Amino acid sequence: MANPIDFYFDFSSPYGYLASTRIDALAARHGRSVVWRPHLLGAVFKINGQQPLASIPLKGNYTAHDLARSARLLKVPFKLPSKFPIGTPTPSRAFYWVHDREPALAKRLAQALYSAYFAQDRDISSPEATVAIATKVGVDKAELEQALNDPAVKDRLRAEVDAAIARGVFGSPYFVVDGEPFWGSDRLDQLDKWLETGGW
């Protein structure tokens, strides 16, 4: 069985959202699975001094234009959220709690959270919003509400973020295939070719 592709993303990352609509199908063409791994860009920014794209003069305006253009090309619904960026510890904690019980459901939750934020302009940062979205995809409401207050669930996310940083992950989306890193949704075609050829 071929190694899975690790897909690192932040729920507040629009390019992560775009990549999330393509990565599973791309991997399947090569007989690969995908491990979805939300992390927190805020933790990375504290280390390397980056700031969100939207807040960078000139680059922010271009990014908004590029995102809309890229979404049209991919035929993916997209609207830059009115509240952007947001903190995403809560949806990320929910993801890992669900993932530890039912990985396939966790992936559906991630897709629903991304769609709510970047297609429907819904702020997903609060426990109430996250739980409402999770309930719609089949997650038990009461259990998730309780889990989000559990220190062990918070520690689980912290461990994932630390592990991602230790691995060199600094952006979203960020992919690792057979030890080879690729950063950015614009590297998916390169990743596809890497899998097709075995690398170069």
Task: Cite the ranges covered by each PLM segment.
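Amphipathic repeat-derived elements
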Residues: 1-5, 55-57
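C-terminal cap of thioredoxin/glutaredoxin-like
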Residues: 3-6, 11-32, 100, 104, ...
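Structural alpha/beta surface segment adjacent to cysteine/selenocysteine redox centers
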Residues: 11, 15-117
